[in-house]
Swiss-Prot record:
Entry note about domains: The first fibronectin type-III domain mediates a specific interaction with Hh protein, in vitro. The second fibronectin type-III domain is additionally required for in vivo signaling activity.
PANTHER family found in the cross-reference section: BROTHER OF IHOG, ISOFORM G-RELATED (PTHR44170:SF33), PROTEIN SIDEKICK (PTHR44170)
Family statement: Belongs to the immunoglobulin superfamily. IHOG family.
Functional description taken from the UniProt entry: Mediates response to the active Hedgehog (Hh) protein signal in embryos, functioning upstream or at the level of patched (ptc).
Quaternary structure (record): Homodimer. Heterotetramer; 2 iHog chains bind 2 hh chains when facilitated by heparin, heparin is required to promote high-affinity interactions between hh and iHog.
Any one cellular-component term (Gene Ontology): axon
Residue spans of biased composition, Low complexity class: 851-863, 887-903
Stretches assigned to the Fibronectin type-III domain: 470-578, 586-681
Organism: Drosophila pseudoobscura pseudoobscura
Protein name: Interference hedgehog
InterPro entries, per database record: FN3_dom, FN3_sf, Ig-like_dom, Ig-like_dom_sf, Ig-like_fold, Ig_sub, Ig_sub2
Disulfide-linked positions: 62-128, 173-220, 276-324, 367-415
Taxonomy of the source species: Eukaryota, Metazoa, Ecdysozoa, Arthropoda, Hexapoda
Compositionally skewed regions (Polar residues) per UniProt: 427-439, 676-689
Residues annotated as transmembrane: 713-733
Gene: iHog
């Protein structure tokens, strides 16, 4: 027997939260409704009760929705197991061993067959048990009973009736017979078998519209359909039919031996025939009514017959009193009361449901059922009776209380409701969150891969041990034929920070033990913030697996101290091909709501005919629409969820989303892709960021890059620097403007300062570029016209008046080489100017005693005395001088040609 499928449900049991599900079908009639299908593993076909004679061989069949690791059968003796009402006794079930000559167990994929030889010591109750790892699913009980037929007492009745023709006669032949299964009846008239018009039950013979041909002696015979045993009833009835001429008018009345009332018990779904005994002359007519049952007579299931009422597909609400009135016009009328009881197999109306429970907490599981007779409830915890569990107590209303939940309770919890008509079961997965045991510093790891190395951290003697809280065992869900999805969580703790996770898995085979394989991806822990009271949840997928193989998985956590610790391993998981699984409902994405700059809300729905019981939760996949990378994943627990918020997104970014539903066994197809975007960032009115509370809505622009969040500060720094630079430049320009000549605009004879400043800089300002300084001699040729103009100005400005300090300049060192052609042009212009001045001087030499000496070859002493004031610089080749002013544009041009500089 291959352990393939069994692992599938085992894993789901311990880590997956499912709604309560009906596990198997009770032995209802075919017409009765069956429980809705359930996710995961369930009993598709439970063994059925059998009545057989001694020495016969019977076969019990049990089928599960998935192939388990193994089947087992349990048994307890029937006489001690239940009383006549079918209530459960204290006798315990025992597991059967095949091959002892009395029974044999065979298995074919997901079907198990138990062959039993009917003997007194094999009569009793049988159960089928499917093992899926630590998960146990138990079927309802099937009974093996001996076929028997017996007669209650030996009282014989011999009746003689005389009736008028046209009446109907009811004879109860088999009131004293008890048969298992119910006997079939044969009727004889004068030793010849007859076929009654109406197939009455319980040995009742009903003769309608009798005539003289109906007269004779009637007898009956009971046959056991299982064993074939026949019992001839010694009672008889002799019928005499009067002629029409000899009959007298008589009111309706009962014949001798006929009861005045009846009590009828029938099973739900059967056909009920009510007969109204009584004869009269003339023939009476039957009228039916019921004070208890609404519309008991006038409905589609009821048919009124001559002296009878037939109700098909009897329901529980047909229970009540029916009254038959016989009237033939002769008073008084005859009333006949029939009390009808409809027995209903048990139905669980409130199945148990369990959530994740912490170890040591108290838990109450509720289960309610209906049925006639009232069903009795009992519980199984992973196939074991709750009566044998010291922590379990069943309340009078049938609820189960676990005073202290233990790890052994994790698994499948089933509630059973039973009466003499059958059983029904519903179960739920119980998850137990174990108490966290603080880990001591360890020297070696266990297993392979990351967990097998020796910790290199030194031992801190006398200090509190380092706490490394491991993650929970992963919950496995099938995604495809080659991939699964793992879900796990880290409980709230104050231990070491987890940096990232690794996923490890290994294949389980019957041969050599396989080593653990480690995936390449690091699953980041993220921000050290708890998402809920239970801790923080994570999701990861594992691909490149092989279908029809069994695997185990575990999660490896790497901590901030560079050590690691692995979780407990998952249950064995059988990766079943998708073709063998029931398809899951596919959700339909309706809308992607823009919730904030960092979050959106998904809205979806299921088809109207989709069964939510198949769903454990949903997987949401999302990524930026401009990206072709991997999808981010989010897990949504609960089948009833119809919306979910996804946060930590980028502002003003378009994303694409898709959904799929999942259960403990498989996942659905993906929904159609739908795009949505986050809100645009809001305009900020202040340079300082606003600190928000925990409950405030996040309106900041999120980013996965921490440096991007500092961009407002960086922008402010750059802006402030630019503003400061502008202020400095403005101040410099303002100072330069203030140092411009104060007399600008007062006379047209002032030289243009912009042109002069191209060659000179003010005294006291920054010195010329020192990097390009070099020693050179500068020869300045004075403008003769300027000397004459300067003499005139000196006459207007007597000595003693202060001169304008702004007119003092020193000449810049030239940064270019003069063109020799320009130098020759300047020399020729100078010579023409000298000749002109000489002519003018010769003509006016006698009359101009105070004229300036325009001889350019004058000595340096004369030039120092009469010319502009000149100051030698400490550096060679530099001359500080007061520049003569030009009186006109032509003079400026002449000055420009005469002020040639030779180096």
């Amino acid at each position: 027997m291959s352990p393939l499928t069994s692992s599938l449900l085992l894993f789901s049991l311990l880590t997956s939260s499912l709604e309560a599900i009906p596990v198997l079908q009770p032995s209802f009639p075919p017409s009765s409704p069956s429980p809705a299908p359930s996710p995961g593993v369930r009993i598709l076909r439970a063994p059925e009760s059998i009545v057989a004679p001694l020495g016969d061989e019977v076969v019990f069949e049990c089928e599960t929705s998935l192939q388990p690791e193994g089947f087992e059968w349990s048994y307890r003796r029937w006489p001690n197991a239940a009383n006549s009402n079918g209530s459960v006794g204290a006798s315990r079930f025992k597991y059967l061993k095949s091959g002892n000559g009395k029974l044999n167990v065979t298995q074919e994929t997901a079907i198990s067959r138990l062959r039993v030889l009917v003997r007194p010591d094999t009569v009793g109750e049988y159960r089928c048990i499917g093992w899926f790892g630590p998960l146990v699913v138990t079927s309802t009980t099937a009974r093996l009973e001996l076929a028997n037929t017996s007669v209650k007492g030996r009282q014989e009745t011999h009746l003689q009736w005389r009736v008028a023709p046209g009446n109907s006669v009811l004879w109860s032949c088999g009131q004293q017979v008890h048969s298992n299964p119910s006997a079939s009846w044969s009727y004889y008239r004068n030793g010849v078998e007859i076929k009654p018009e109406l197939a009455a039950t319980n040995g009742n013979l009903f003769l309608t519209n009798v005539s003289t041909a109906s007269a004779g002696k009637y007898t009956c015979l009971a046959t056991n359909p299982a064993s074939g045993a026949r019992i001839e009833i010694s009672s008889s009835m002799v019928l005499e039919v009067l002629s029409g001429r000899g009959s007298q008018n008589k009111a309706p009345h009962l014949l001798s031996g006929q009861p005045t009332s009846q009590a009828v018990t029938i099973r739900e779904g059967s056909t009920l025939l009510l007969l109204c005994p009584g004869v009269g002359s003339p023939t009476p007519t039957a009228v039916w009514s019921s004070p208890d049952v609404v519309e008991a007579i006038h409905n589609k299931r009821t048919r009124v017959l001559n002296h009878g009422l037939e109700i098909s597909n009897v329901q529980g609400h047909d229970t009540g009193t029916y009254i038959c009135y016989l009237d033939n016009g002769v008073r008084p009328t005859l009333e006949h009361f029939i009390n009808v009881t409809v027995e209903v197999p048990p139905r669980i109306t409130r199945p148990p449901w369990a959530d994740l429970t912490n170890e040591g907490e108290r838990m109450q599981l509720e289960c309610e059922a209906t049925g006639v007779p009232a069903p009795e409830l009992y519980w199984l915890l992973n196939g074991e009776s709750s009566i044998n569990d010291t922590e379990a107590e069943q309340l009078p209303n049938g609820y189960l209380v676990l005073h202290s939940v233990q790890k052994r309770h994790a698994g499948y919890v089933q509630c059973f409701a039973r009466n003499r008509l059958g059983e029904q079961s519903a179960g739920t997965l119980l998850q137990v969150n174990p108490k966290q045991i603080q880990s001591e510093p360890r020297e070696t790891g266990s297993g392979g891969g990351f967990g097998s190395h020796r910790s290199m951290k030194p031992v801190n003697h006398g200090q509190k041990p380092t706490k490394m809280i491991p993650p929970s065992p992963p919950n496995v869900t099938r995604l495809s034929d080659e991939s699964v999805m793992l879900r796990w969580h880290v409980p709230r703790n104050d231990g070491l920070l987890i940096l990232f996770f690794k996923v490890q898995y290994r294949m389980i085979s019957e041969g050599k033990r396989k080593n653990w394989q480690t995936t390449n991806d690091n699953i980041p822990y993220g921000k050290p913030k708890w998402n809920s009271e239970l801790g923080k949840s994570f999701t990861a997928s594992v691909t490149d697996l092989k279908p029809q193989r069994t695997y185990r998985f575990r999660i490896l956590a790497v901590y901030s101290n560079n050590d690691n610790k692995e979780s407990n391993t998952s249950a064995k998981f059988y990766l079943q091909p998708g073709a063998a699984l029931e398809p899951m409902p596919v959700p339909e994405l309706l809308e992607i709501e823009e919730y904030s700059e960092t979050a959106v809300v998904l809205h979806w729905r299921l088809d109207s005919d989709a069964d939510e019981h198949l769903i454990t939760g949903y997987y949401a996949y999302y990524r930026p629409s401009s990206s072709a990378g991997e999808y981010y994943k989010a897990t949504i627990e609960g089948a009833h969820a119809r919306s979910f918020q996804i946060a930590t997104l980028e502002a003003a970014t378009i994303y694409e989303f898709k959904l799929q539903s999942f259960s403990a066994v498989s996942a659905s197809e993906f929904s159609a892709l739908k795009q949505g975007r986050t809100q645009r960032p809001k305009a900020s009115t202040t340079e300082e960021p606003t600190i928000q509370g925990i409950g405030d809505r996040d309106t900041t622009t999120p980013s996965h890059n921490e440096t991007f969040s500092m961009s407002p500060m960086l922008t402010g720094t750059i802006g402030g620097g630019a503003l400061l630079l502008i202020l400095l430049v403005s101040a410099f320009l303002c100072m330069c403007r203030r140092r411009s000549p104060r007399g600008r605009g007062q006379t047209q004879n002032k030289p243009r300062m912009a042109e002069l400043r191209e060659d000179f800089v003010p005294l006291g300002s920054c010195s010329p570029n020192k990097q390009r300084q070099r020693t050179r001699h500068i020869h300045i040729t004075l403008n003769p016209l300027a000397q004459q103009q300067q003499q005139q100005l000196d006459e207007k400005n007597p000595p003693g008046l202060e001169t304008d300090n702004d007119m003092a300049y020193f000449q810049r060192q030239p940064t270019y080489e003069y063109d020799p052609g320009l130098r020759r042009m300047s020399s020729s212009s100078l010579r023409r100017s000298q000749r002109t001045l000489e002519r003018a001087g010769g003509a006016n030499s006698g009359g101009n005693n105070g004229g300036n000496n325009n001889n350019l070859n004058q000595s340096s002493e004369a030039g120092t005395a009469d010319g502009p004031c000149m100051q030698s610089s400490s550096k060679p080749g530099r001359v500080i001088m007061k520049r003569p002013r030009l009186s006109s544009r032509s003079e400026n041009l002449s000055s420009g040609s005469l002020n040639s500089v030779g180096v």
